[in-house]
Amino acid sequence: MNILDELAWRGAINQVSDEEGLRKLLDKKSVGLYCGVDPTGDSLHIGHLIPFMMLKRFQEAGHRAHIIIGGGTGSIGDPSGKKSERVLQTMEQVHHNEEALTKQMKHLFGKDNITIVNNRDWLSKIDLLGFLRDYGKLFNVNTMLNKEVVASRLEVGISFTEFTYQILQSIDFHHLWKNNDVQLQIGGADQWGNITSGIDLIHKMEGSEAEAYALTIPLMLKADGTKFGKTAGGAVWLDPEKTTPYEFYQFWLNQDDRDVIKYLKYFTFLSQEEIADLEEKVKTQPEKREAQRRLAEETVEFVHGKEAVKEAEHISAALFSGEVKDLTASEIEQGFKNMPSVEVTAEPKNIVEWLVDTGIESSKRQAREDVTNGAIRINGDRIQDLEFTIDPSAEFDGKFVIVRRGKKKYFLARVK
């Protein structure tokens, strides 16, 4: 099967320039292709997974994947998808972000069939007069103004700096075409204009027979019409310090039945048969959420590894059952990151007083009532003795006390 057919089945193709020509090229040889990312932050988020999952599929199929870290383009800002001018970063920020993104890319793509480059290495060598003479003459301003990425900004205004972004991205494509034997650029749907500008530049500089292609991915929307990738808490990051593997796992586990098969096709390497089986289970046994569970397992393993999957599942099972005693300190940090927390001393104290002092209970009367009724669990154990003494240093390396009030309300007490 041609990889384009596989991508089409997975719903991963928005537009292709000269599909017939690209098909023939893919059948004939190992193709060089690339995707770029500007270092606007020090971590990728799940929105970045959309083009990079496609790049990974090409890599797995034996094609030569390239990633451009946009140290040059990132210093001026891509107007794509933005309603206003980007705030320029300091070069120190850009360098820091470049290093962080490169590390993440190496983790995701490994060492085989992957080349990571920085476009500052060649863009910084072009002087102003050379830029205007060698490249400026080849770009028609009317054509540039009609590109969606620019046209959408004309009413509110766009700086010359961001206006020229598509020229720099075109230079990138030409550079990789000439020096790295790269014939295909992939990107999000909003990158179509920038990518096709690069194809035009290659044809003008190398001749109309030069093989250069564009492939874009559809904008991914959820069943409710909102954009994929955002949560109430903001972006979902690939950096475990920003979004823990447990949070990452929960994000995928909580996907809507209407979306889960689409995400399994796009964000996993499961076969058509495996996904068809899970699709049937969504229809016949939706309450088991097997498709969501498999989606969470596959995505966490891809981004964080197998051990992270085990940890996330262990935390989920412990919080669901209330059996939290077996959690490690690291797992507690992950699982309780966004739950209410208080600081306490290591001093042992009567449970009623302790619950009121921590603010978990509003009054001693309420505390006594909840304890007596069995509504309070300390580190997984139901406590109904009003004379019980809490010793914060007794478990979890003396770092935490886990309190559950009722069936689902958790609190984390951190020992000072």
From Swiss-Prot:
Main localization category: cytoplasm
Enzyme Commission code(s) on record: 6.1.1.1
Catalytic activity: tRNA(Tyr) + L-tyrosine + ATP = L-tyrosyl-tRNA(Tyr) + AMP + diphosphate + H(+)
Extent of motif 'KMSKS' region: 227-231
Motif ('HIGH' region): 39-48
GO biological process, any: tyrosyl-tRNA aminoacylation
Domain S4 RNA-binding: 349-416
Any one Pfam family match given in the protein's UniProt record, by short name: SYY_C-terminal
UniProtKB keywords: Aminoacyl-tRNA synthetase, ATP-binding, Cytoplasm, Ligase, Nucleotide-binding, Protein biosynthesis, RNA-binding
Superkingdom of origin: Bacteria
UniProt lineage: Bacteria, Bacillati, Bacillota, Bacilli, Lactobacillales
Binding site for ATP: 230
Subunit-level organization: Homodimer.
This protein's record includes keyword Transferase: no
Residues annotated for L-tyrosine binding in this entry: 34, 165, 169
Localization annotation: Cytoplasm
InterPro entries in UniProt: aa-tRNA-synth_I_CS, aa-tRNA-synth_Ic, Rossmann-like_a/b/a_fold, S4_RNA-bd_sf, SYY-like_C, Tyr-tRNA-ligase, Tyr-tRNA-ligase_bac-type, Tyr-tRNA-ligase_bac_1
One cellular component term from this protein's GO annotations in UniProt: cytosol
Protein name: Tyrosine--tRNA ligase
MF terms in GO: ATP binding; RNA binding; tyrosine-tRNA ligase activity
Function: Catalyzes the attachment of tyrosine to tRNA(Tyr) in a two-step reaction: tyrosine is first activated by ATP to form Tyr-AMP and then transferred to the acceptor end of tRNA(Tyr).
Family per record: Belongs to the class-I aminoacyl-tRNA synthetase family. TyrS type 1 subfamily.
